[in-house]
Amino acid sequence: MTSIKNNNENKHIVVYRKIHQSLIEKLENQGYKVTQFEPINSNNIQEFYEAIKTANGLIGSVFKIDENVLSKAPFLECVSAISVGYDNYDLVVLNDRKIPLMHTPNVLNDSMADIMMGLMITVARKLAYCDKRMRNGEWNGPLDKSWFGLEVHHKKVGIIGMGRIGEVLAKRCRMGFDMEVAYYSRSRHLKVEELYDAKHQDLDTILSTSDFICVVLPGSQETKHFFSFGQFSKMKNSAIFINAGRGMTVDEVALIDALETGKIAGAGLDVFEKEPLNKDSKLLTLDNIVLLPHIGTSTIETQHIMSECAVNNLISALNGNLEKNCVNASIIKK
């Protein structure tokens, strides 16, 4: 644990993830006392609990901020997540205590769309599979069809969840790869339809006609196992399934079955039901899936921008400004 003191300690901020020193200094220059954990682990968890007893603000990600944690922070005025998703935060308790929860939308749209596009290409063209075989010394002459992949360009992509990330992904698919774009969403997005000739279709139509299914759904009880046996059975056997939204939206048992039985051709995952992925997961034994350790936003540039946004969000919230990036602003203002 690194404790950074300040002459004007009117408010105490606990940062529970490593952020750039310039951002720590920005908080200090605002008059805050800052305590930083890089990150929370079994060796410093008790120190963290002790620190939040006097905390007015929290900044971080990954670590679960549940009722137990919040009960140890009686003076808490704001929580600022270095993420877009907020399923690691007990929103019921935060709402009840009128504590604003800030997050960092928009800043990661491009990096998320890039990782999904990368997964589409890697799975379709068997890049990881071919790399593995080359390293095993299997390239001994002309290639047989087991090395061959599928085209990406001019195919149909079905985007499930047309939010900010979905819109940026649609742009890449349409403008970069001349793909036909369809999307499933509660409401229509006329801008996407106009710019990228995207079609708003029902779920069954998208599942049965798309070459690529790309999932960017948020995590909630409503979307838990949104994709299970029934959904995979409706897909083309040449379909490729990509998920970089939330792991809970996919029933991994059903996905494994679809991959093993040839119901779909392949898959690419950046998120999982349980993270880190269990070392004995059957997903690790399959050659027709590409697995990434939740790195959708893990670029140096995006991580810094997200951290900077989270710091700015916290400062704004502690100054009473909830107009931007506040998840529960409508509850707080009641």
UniProtKB/Swiss-Prot annotation:
InterPro entries: D-isomer_2-hydroxyacid_DH, D-isomer_2_OHA_DH_cat_dom, D-isomer_DH_NAD-bd, NAD(P)-bd_dom_sf
Main location: cytoplasm
Catalytic EC class: oxidoreductase
GO MF, any single term: gluconate 2-dehydrogenase activity
EC number: 1.1.1.215
Signal peptide limits: none
Compartment list: Cytoplasm
Sites where the protein binds NAD(+): 164-165, 244-246, 270, 294-297
Active site: 246, 275, 294 (proton donor)
Catalytic activity: D-gluconate + NADP(+) = 2-dehydro-D-gluconate + NADPH + H(+)
GO CC terms, sorted: cytosol
Keyword check for NADP: yes
Pfam families in the record: 2-Hacid_dh, 2-Hacid_dh_C
Annotated GO biological process: D-gluconate metabolic process
Domain of life: Eukaryota
Keywords of the record: Cytoplasm, Gluconate utilization, NADP, Oxidoreductase
UniProt cross-references to PANTHER family, sorted A to Z: 2-HYDROXYACID DEHYDROGENASE-RELATED, GLYOXYLATE REDUCTASE 1
Similarity comment: family membership: Belongs to the D-isomer specific 2-hydroxyacid dehydrogenase family.
Function description: Catalyzes the NADPH-dependent reduction of 2,5-diketo-D-gluconate (25DKG) to 5-keto-D-gluconate (5KDG), 2-keto-D-gluconate (2KDG) to D-gluconate, and 2-keto-L-gulonate (2KLG) to L-idonate (IA).
Protein name, entry field: Probable 2-ketogluconate reductase
Lineage, top ranks: Eukaryota, Amoebozoa, Evosea, Eumycetozoa, Dictyostelia
